[in-house]
Regions:
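Histidine-centered nuclease catalytic patch
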Residues: 32-62, 71-83
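Short, charged surface segments at domain edges that flank catalytic/cofactor-binding sites
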Residues: 1-31, 88, 95-104, 108
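A detector for short metal-coordination/catalytic motifs
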Residues: 58-59, 69-133
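Short, contiguous, helix-prone interaction/anchoring segments in small proteins
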Residues: 23-28, 32-38, 120-122
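Intrinsic disorder/low-complexity signal
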Residues: 4, 10, 43, 125-128
Length: 133
């Protein structure tokens, strides 16, 4: 049997691929909200879909339900600057994430919160494997 003859689960079930992509985004931050550091329970679009934001790794970040709901359809960078828990290190991490530099984003988040434990340090693999939702 050749590799071209193989059938892959993600080809048969797009929801499986989407679920794996979402899990990989949470793993990047050790399952913590990129905005406040609490446990992440959702994926937030930094640039909202209503403003043309895409469902790509660079535009989707792990967020707690509180931050995701409060931010709503606002641009994350503008919204984040007005929060009481604003941290310039996290703001730089959000900017790095948007620019596709996940390695820098994770380092900045670890600087802001040394308790973050990243399970998967292979940023390149996850970034390319789960590019779009």
């Amino acid at each position: 049997m050749h590799i071209n003859d193989a059938v892959f689960l993600e080809d048969l079930c797009p929801k499986f691929r989407l679920r794996q992509w979402r899990k990989s985004i949470h793993r990047f931050t050790g399952k913590s909200c990129i905005y406040c550091g609490k446990p992440s329970e959702s994926i937030d679009h930094v640039i909202p879909q209503s403003q043309g934001g895409l469902s790509t790794t660079e535009n989707c970040v792990p967020a707690c339900l509180s931050c995701n709901g409060d931010k709503s359809d606002e641009n994350a960078l503008y919204w984040y600057r007005r929060q009481k828990f604003y941290d310039p290190r996290r703001a730089m991490a959000i900017r790095a994430w948007l620019e596709g530099d996940l390695r820098l984003a994770i380092r900045l988040l670890q600087w802001a919160n040394p308790n973050i434990k990243v399970k998967n340090k292979n940023y390149k693999k996850d970034e390319s494997e789960y590019k779009a939702a």
